Amino acid sequence: MNIPGMTTGMAPAGATAGAGFPGAGAGMQGMSEQEQAMVKAMHAAMESCPVKTVISGTMGFGLGGVFGLFMASMSYDSTFTPQGKAIMDLPWREQVRRGFKDMGSRSWSSAKNFGIVGALYSGTECCVEGLRAKNDLSNSVISGCITGGILGAKAGPQAAAAGCAGFAAFSAAIDAYMRMPSEE
């Protein structure tokens, strides 16, 4: 089977590490001009800011939905609180119905929030990288500050400043960790 970007068979001695895996030094040998043009178009599309933003927003939405569902399933009402006592007095079916309704609403809320944060940060980082024409740690700090500031802006200037500082620090820490050389 001929898959663009993959070599067939075993890699010869002296080949680059990872040869035979998609995008790992295989190049476009053995592909027709049409296949090469298609691969280049796919790479160009994946590098565009709108596509990166949509992908990050979609992945954030999915992850947020799963996270919200998990967190809602872990929360429980104690029978020692007035709300817990009221729920425990309901019939079993009503308890289950309310539980699923709560799980759905929390899942939807988390999905929206994660999707917005993912799309906003990814889009901002892509634009900053394009404007600076560099791929370094500063892009993450600038993008984190802009994203945190936008997310905190509704709560006032102090919240926007705190969001800027917090999100920038978190983004810098994650990006610095991701850029560390692997121990191979």
UniProtKB/Swiss-Prot annotation:
Positions of transmembrane segments: 8-28, 54-74, 150-170
Top-level taxon of origin: Eukaryota
Gene Ontology MF terms: mitochondrion targeting sequence binding; protein transmembrane transporter activity; structural molecule activity
GO terms under cellular component: TIM22 mitochondrial import inner membrane insertion complex
Topology of the protein relative to the lipid bilayer: Multi-pass membrane protein
Function: Essential core component of the TIM22 complex, a complex that mediates the import and insertion of multi-pass transmembrane proteins into the mitochondrial inner membrane. In the TIM22 complex, it constitutes the voltage-activated and signal-gated channel. Forms a twin-pore translocase that uses the membrane potential as external driving force in 2 voltage-dependent steps.
Subunit note: Component of the TIM22 complex, whose core is composed of TIM22 and TIM54, associated with the 70 kDa heterohexamer composed of TIM9 and TIM10 (or TIM8 and TIM13).
Cited PANTHER family: MITOCHONDRIAL IMPORT INNER MEMBRANE TRANSLOCASE SUBUNIT TIM22 (PTHR14110:SF0)
UniProt name for this protein: Mitochondrial import inner membrane translocase subunit tim22
Organism: Aspergillus oryzae (strain ATCC 42149 / RIB 40)
